Amino acid sequence: MYEYIKGTLTHINESYVVIESFGIGYAIMLSERFLVDLRAFMHQEVLIYVHSVIRETEHVLYGFSSRAERECFRLLISFSGIGPKTGLSILNMFPLQELCSIARLENVKAIASVPGIGKKTAEKLMVDLKQKLPTLMPLYLEEPVVPSSTANSSFKEGIGALMNLGFSRLAADRMMTEAVKELSEEASVAELLPIALRKS
Protein backbone atom coordinates (compact mmCIF):
# COMPACT_ATOMS: atom_id res chain seq x y z
CA MET A 1 0.00 0.00 0.00
CA TYR A 2 1.28 3.46 -0.91
CA GLU A 3 1.04 6.46 1.45
CA TYR A 4 1.96 9.01 -1.21
CA ILE A 5 3.88 9.32 -4.46
CA LYS A 6 6.42 12.09 -4.93
CA GLY A 7 7.86 12.72 -8.36
CA THR A 8 7.74 14.76 -11.54
CA LEU A 9 4.38 15.56 -13.11
CA THR A 10 4.88 14.42 -16.73
CA HIS A 11 1.36 14.08 -18.16
CA ILE A 12 -2.16 15.36 -17.51
CA ASN A 13 -5.22 13.66 -19.00
CA GLU A 14 -8.93 14.39 -18.59
CA SER A 15 -9.19 12.10 -15.56
CA TYR A 16 -5.66 11.23 -14.46
CA VAL A 17 -2.06 12.38 -14.25
CA VAL A 18 1.24 10.56 -14.64
CA ILE A 19 3.91 11.04 -11.98
CA GLU A 20 7.40 9.75 -12.78
CA SER A 21 9.37 8.59 -9.76
CA PHE A 22 12.67 6.69 -10.02
CA GLY A 23 12.00 5.76 -13.63
CA ILE A 24 8.46 4.49 -13.06
CA GLY A 25 5.38 6.34 -14.34
CA TYR A 26 2.39 6.14 -12.01
CA ALA A 27 -1.06 6.84 -13.49
CA ILE A 28 -3.19 8.41 -10.75
CA MET A 29 -6.92 9.15 -11.02
CA LEU A 30 -7.87 12.60 -9.71
CA SER A 31 -10.92 14.81 -9.30
CA GLU A 32 -11.43 17.47 -11.97
CA ARG A 33 -10.80 20.19 -9.39
CA PHE A 34 -7.43 18.74 -8.41
CA LEU A 35 -6.47 18.26 -12.07
CA VAL A 36 -7.05 21.96 -12.72
CA ASP A 37 -4.86 22.91 -9.75
CA LEU A 38 -2.02 20.67 -10.93
CA ARG A 39 -1.81 22.13 -14.44
CA ALA A 40 0.42 24.92 -13.12
CA PHE A 41 2.95 22.33 -11.90
CA MET A 42 3.64 20.50 -15.18
CA HIS A 43 7.20 19.08 -15.24
CA GLN A 44 7.68 20.04 -11.59
CA GLU A 45 7.96 17.85 -8.50
CA VAL A 46 4.68 17.20 -6.70
CA LEU A 47 3.54 15.00 -3.84
CA ILE A 48 0.17 13.28 -4.10
CA TYR A 49 -1.47 11.22 -1.36
CA VAL A 50 -2.89 8.01 -2.83
CA HIS A 51 -5.43 5.28 -2.17
CA SER A 52 -5.04 1.92 -3.95
CA VAL A 53 -7.98 -0.08 -5.25
CA ILE A 54 -6.91 -3.59 -6.21
CA ARG A 55 -9.19 -5.95 -8.09
CA GLU A 56 -8.56 -9.14 -10.08
CA THR A 57 -8.16 -7.33 -13.38
CA GLU A 58 -6.90 -3.91 -12.35
CA HIS A 59 -4.89 -1.87 -9.85
CA VAL A 60 -6.07 1.75 -9.70
CA LEU A 61 -4.48 4.63 -7.78
CA TYR A 62 -6.69 7.53 -6.67
CA GLY A 63 -4.89 10.75 -5.75
CA PHE A 64 -5.61 13.57 -3.30
CA SER A 65 -4.16 16.95 -2.39
CA SER A 66 -3.97 16.18 1.33
CA ARG A 67 -4.11 13.33 3.80
CA ALA A 68 -7.41 14.68 5.12
CA GLU A 69 -9.00 14.57 1.67
CA ARG A 70 -7.84 10.99 1.20
CA GLU A 71 -9.24 9.92 4.57
CA CYS A 72 -12.53 11.58 3.65
CA PHE A 73 -12.54 9.56 0.41
CA ARG A 74 -11.94 6.36 2.39
CA LEU A 75 -14.82 7.27 4.68
CA LEU A 76 -17.12 7.87 1.72
CA ILE A 77 -16.34 4.58 -0.06
CA SER A 78 -16.92 2.64 3.17
CA PHE A 79 -20.64 3.31 2.75
CA SER A 80 -22.74 0.77 0.87
CA GLY A 81 -23.53 1.90 -2.66
CA ILE A 82 -20.68 4.40 -2.94
CA GLY A 83 -17.71 3.29 -5.03
CA PRO A 84 -14.43 5.06 -5.81
CA LYS A 85 -15.80 6.97 -8.80
CA THR A 86 -18.78 8.30 -6.84
CA GLY A 87 -16.55 9.13 -3.87
CA LEU A 88 -14.27 11.11 -6.17
CA SER A 89 -17.31 12.89 -7.66
CA ILE A 90 -18.41 13.98 -4.19
CA LEU A 91 -14.97 15.43 -3.42
CA ASN A 92 -14.91 17.11 -6.81
CA MET A 93 -18.16 18.93 -6.08
CA PHE A 94 -17.51 19.64 -2.41
CA PRO A 95 -14.08 20.42 -0.87
CA LEU A 96 -13.63 18.94 2.61
CA GLN A 97 -14.52 22.15 4.47
CA GLU A 98 -17.72 22.54 2.44
CA LEU A 99 -18.60 18.87 2.93
CA CYS A 100 -18.29 19.34 6.70
CA SER A 101 -20.66 22.31 6.49
CA ILE A 102 -23.14 20.28 4.42
CA ALA A 103 -23.05 17.46 6.97
CA ARG A 104 -23.46 19.86 9.90
CA LEU A 105 -26.52 21.45 8.26
CA GLU A 106 -27.82 18.02 7.16
CA ASN A 107 -28.16 19.28 3.60
CA VAL A 108 -29.35 16.04 2.00
CA LYS A 109 -30.31 17.85 -1.20
CA ALA A 110 -26.69 18.88 -1.83
CA ILE A 111 -25.36 15.32 -1.49
CA ALA A 112 -28.23 13.94 -3.59
CA SER A 113 -27.19 16.30 -6.40
CA VAL A 114 -24.04 14.22 -6.98
CA PRO A 115 -24.49 11.89 -9.98
CA GLY A 116 -25.07 8.33 -8.80
CA ILE A 117 -26.46 9.20 -5.37
CA GLY A 118 -30.18 8.99 -4.69
CA LYS A 119 -32.11 10.62 -1.86
CA LYS A 120 -32.17 7.50 0.35
CA THR A 121 -28.43 6.95 0.01
CA ALA A 122 -27.83 10.64 0.71
CA GLU A 123 -29.94 10.49 3.88
CA LYS A 124 -28.04 7.47 5.21
CA LEU A 125 -24.71 9.00 4.26
CA MET A 126 -25.54 12.25 6.03
CA VAL A 127 -25.96 10.56 9.42
CA ASP A 128 -22.43 9.13 9.47
CA LEU A 129 -20.83 12.13 7.78
CA LYS A 130 -22.16 14.48 10.44
CA GLN A 131 -20.56 12.35 13.14
CA LYS A 132 -17.25 11.39 11.50
CA LEU A 133 -16.22 14.22 9.17
CA PRO A 134 -15.25 16.77 11.87
CA THR A 135 -12.57 14.35 13.12
CA LEU A 136 -10.75 14.78 9.80
CA MET A 137 -10.45 18.57 9.97
CA PRO A 138 -7.19 18.64 12.00
CA LEU A 139 -5.54 16.79 9.12
CA TYR A 140 -6.64 19.55 6.77
CA LEU A 141 -4.07 21.92 8.28
CA GLU A 142 -1.07 20.13 6.83
CA GLU A 143 1.53 21.07 4.23
CA PRO A 144 0.34 21.71 0.67
CA VAL A 145 1.08 19.15 -2.06
CA VAL A 146 3.90 21.29 -3.42
CA PRO A 147 5.74 22.66 -0.38
CA SER A 148 6.47 26.32 -0.72
CA SER A 149 10.02 27.57 -0.60
CA THR A 150 8.90 30.60 1.39
CA ALA A 151 8.02 30.14 5.04
CA ASN A 152 7.54 33.72 6.26
CA SER A 153 4.41 34.83 8.09
CA SER A 154 3.11 36.99 5.21
CA PHE A 155 3.21 33.99 2.90
CA LYS A 156 1.32 31.80 5.36
CA GLU A 157 -1.22 34.53 6.10
CA GLY A 158 -1.74 34.99 2.37
CA ILE A 159 -2.42 31.29 1.87
CA GLY A 160 -4.95 31.37 4.69
CA ALA A 161 -6.69 34.41 3.22
CA LEU A 162 -6.91 32.84 -0.24
CA MET A 163 -8.31 29.60 1.19
CA ASN A 164 -10.96 31.64 3.02
CA LEU A 165 -11.89 33.07 -0.38
CA GLY A 166 -12.52 29.55 -1.65
CA PHE A 167 -9.23 28.64 -3.32
CA SER A 168 -7.78 25.19 -2.65
CA ARG A 169 -4.60 24.95 -0.58
CA LEU A 170 -2.62 23.91 -3.65
CA ALA A 171 -3.94 26.82 -5.74
CA ALA A 172 -3.32 29.28 -2.89
CA ASP A 173 0.27 28.07 -2.53
CA ARG A 174 0.88 28.47 -6.26
CA MET A 175 -0.64 31.97 -6.36
CA MET A 176 1.36 33.18 -3.36
CA THR A 177 4.57 31.64 -4.69
CA GLU A 178 4.15 33.55 -7.96
CA ALA A 179 3.36 36.76 -6.06
CA VAL A 180 6.53 36.41 -3.97
CA LYS A 181 8.57 35.87 -7.13
CA GLU A 182 7.13 39.09 -8.58
CA LEU A 183 7.73 41.14 -5.41
CA SER A 184 10.01 39.72 -2.71
CA GLU A 185 9.99 37.47 0.35
CA GLU A 186 9.94 40.58 2.54
CA ALA A 187 6.68 41.91 1.02
CA SER A 188 3.69 42.26 3.33
CA VAL A 189 0.53 40.20 2.93
CA ALA A 190 -1.32 43.38 1.88
CA GLU A 191 1.16 43.83 -0.97
CA LEU A 192 1.18 40.16 -1.97
CA LEU A 193 -2.56 39.40 -2.03
CA PRO A 194 -3.60 41.70 -4.93
CA ILE A 195 -0.86 40.21 -7.10
CA ALA A 196 -1.70 36.66 -5.98
CA LEU A 197 -5.34 37.16 -6.98
CA ARG A 198 -4.26 38.17 -10.47
CA LYS A 199 -2.50 34.80 -10.73
CA SER A 200 -5.71 32.80 -10.20
Curated annotation (Swiss-Prot):
Question: For the region Flexible linker, what residue ranges are annotated?
Answer: 145-149
What is a biological process (GO) this protein takes part in?
DNA repair
Q: Which GO terms of the cellular component aspect does the record hold? A: cytoplasm; Holliday junction helicase complex; Holliday junction resolvase complex
* Keywords for this protein: Cytoplasm, DNA damage, DNA recombination, DNA repair, DNA-binding
Instruction: Cite the residue spans of the region called Domain III.
Output: 150-200
Q: Which InterPro entries match?
A: DNA_helicase_Holl-junc_RuvA_I, Hlx-hairpin-Hlx_DNA-bd_motif, NA-bd_OB-fold, RuvA, RuvA_2-like, RuvA_C
Q: Where would you find this protein in the cell?
A: Cytoplasm
**GO MF annotations, alphabetized:** ATP binding; four-way junction DNA binding; four-way junction helicase activity
Main localisation, per the record?
cytoplasm
What Pfam families would the database entry show?
A: HHH_5 (PF14520), RuvA_N (PF01330)
Q: Does the keyword 4Fe-4S apply?
A: no
Residue numbers spanned by region Domain I: 1-65
Recorded hits in Gene3D superfamilies, A to Z, give: 5' to 3' exonuclease, C-terminal subdomain, DNA helicase RuvA subunit, C-terminal domain, Nucleic acid-binding proteins
Family matches, as SUPFAM superfamilies: Nucleic acid-binding proteins, RuvA domain 2-like
Region called Domain II, residue ranges? 66-144
What's the stated role of this polypeptide?
The RuvA-RuvB-RuvC complex processes Holliday junction (HJ) DNA during genetic recombination and DNA repair, while the RuvA-RuvB complex plays an important role in the rescue of blocked DNA replication forks via replication fork reversal (RFR). RuvA specifically binds to HJ cruciform DNA, conferring on it an open structure. The RuvB hexamer acts as an ATP-dependent pump, pulling dsDNA into and through the RuvAB complex. HJ branch migration allows RuvC to scan DNA until it finds its consensus sequence, where it cleaves and resolves the cruciform DNA.
Q: Which family does it belong to?
A: Belongs to the RuvA family.
What does the subunit comment say? Homotetramer. Forms an RuvA(8)-RuvB(12)-Holliday junction (HJ) complex. HJ DNA is sandwiched between 2 RuvA tetramers; dsDNA enters through RuvA and exits via RuvB. An RuvB hexamer assembles on each DNA strand where it exits the tetramer. Each RuvB hexamer is contacted by two RuvA subunits (via domain III) on 2 adjacent RuvB subunits; this complex drives branch migration. In the full resolvosome a probable DNA-RuvA(4)-RuvB(12)-RuvC(2) complex forms which resolves the HJ.
Q: Please quote what the entry notes about the protein's domains.
A: Has three domains with a flexible linker between the domains II and III and assumes an 'L' shape. Domain III is highly mobile and contacts RuvB.
Report what the protein is called: Holliday junction branch migration complex subunit RuvA
